[in-house]
Amino acid sequence: GSGMGILLMLVSLALFVIGFTMGGLNYMITVLQARTRGMTLMRMPLTVWGIFTATVLAMLAFPALLVSAIMMTLDKVLGTSFFMPTILKAGEVLEYGGGSPILFQHLFWFFGHPEVYIVALPAFGIVSDLISVHARKNIFGYRMMVWAIVGIGALSFFVWAHHMYVSGMNPWFGFFFATTTLIIAVPTAMKVYNWILTLWRGNIRINTVMLWCLGSVSYTHLRAHETQPY
């Protein structure tokens, strides 16, 4: 892009990542070191587990976004060629050369797919706790739910290139990322069925909160807005 707007966007993006990293460190240290007496990790609310795992993901994923913003800024300001291949402009060969737009895609999606779970995992934790409260039952399989959250977070770093099947990526890499994409469905399904088993024979209060939670369960299971009944 041309003009000052792109440069300001890249600088603001870098500042955002730095600020988020500082806030994420604060949250991680609070969870690990400042819990109340008797509150072990395996007694924490699932909401806290979701936010904590999302924070760890952000601490690992956002630096890739920061690096890509810095590299793009250097391409724009100093004439480097991290992302610019040899191209023609008005019939003349640019000074830039040797870069790869695919590199930008990898850096972006290495951030971009864990970012999906940075958004989703806290919501999963909130839904888990609300279903438990409004079904008046302890959450079914608490430890399983914790490990499902952690497993989803870990696997989220091995599926990013499923956004890049048509980018010219090696087919064997595509096979690997397709396989990991299928595997990540396992802990997600564990969470959904644990929600259903928590609802089973529970003393359910049909109020606004529970209706939203039931909508979340059905949406996570059906994965389609068109089939969302709530």
Stretches with model-predicted labels:
Residues 1-3, 21-50, 68-102, 106, ...:
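Membrane-interfacial helix termini and the short, flexible loops that connect transmembrane helices
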Residues 1-22, 58, 66:
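Active-site cavity-forming subdomains of large catalytic enzyme subunits
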Residues 1-11, 101-115, 177, 181:
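Short aromatic-rich membrane-water interface segments that cap or initiate transmembrane helices
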Residues 12, 16, 50, 54-57, ...:
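Hydrophobic alpha-helical transmembrane segments of polytopic
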Residues 53-69, 219:
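Hydrophobic alpha-helical membrane-insertion segments
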Residues 116-124, 189:
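Hydrophobic alpha-helical transmembrane segments
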Residues 151, 157-162, 172-191:
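Acidic, glycine-rich loop-and-beta core segments that form the ion-binding/anion-interacting portion
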Residues 220-229:
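Conserved small/polar residues in nucleotide/adenosyl-binding loops
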